[in-house]
Amino acid sequence: MKKTAIALALASAVALTACGNDEPDGTDTGMEDPTVSQWEQPEVRGPLQDTDQEDVDKVAHDVVEQIFSWSPKDDHTIADAARKAEPLMDEDFAYNNRDSWAGMFKVPGKQWASWVNDNATTSVELTEGLEERPEDTDMEARRQYSVEVTIKGDKQEQKLRYDVFAHFNNLGWWRLDNITISQPQTMS
């Protein structure tokens, strides 16, 4: 029985050696190098289509400016401008705030209607706040702006100023994921 076990072990060793590769050691190239693919910015349509989504400063400026780019002549409600900025917002944030924008601006519907009736147009001026804030990381950034909206109609002109605090996250591309908008201050 011992001789049979030894013979079987010897036969197995010879068989395994015969199945080996004839190439000398060190010639196996291993796995092929992976194909390098580059990420392309997600396509954004509308007024923010040219925004560089890798630049948090550009995203922050363009999103905040668009949120306040009200168009009483063309838009149904004051919230339409913010909805146009949704492509550069975090999906959950955009969804959760879709019905809240008019309330965030604190402009009554009656005021919006008066701007519509006055054929008003708006212009927006942003000034970045340079107050101390947490440093940007690869994944998040914060920005603060003073936003002045000038509403000019056929019969009246009005200026509103807001303080805006915005938080952005980076999950491949910068997106607005939180915003705080102050009470409007009427400017003379």
Task: Report each predicted region and the residues it spans.
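Structured, amphipathic secondary-structure segments that form assembly/contact surfaces
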Residues: 75-188
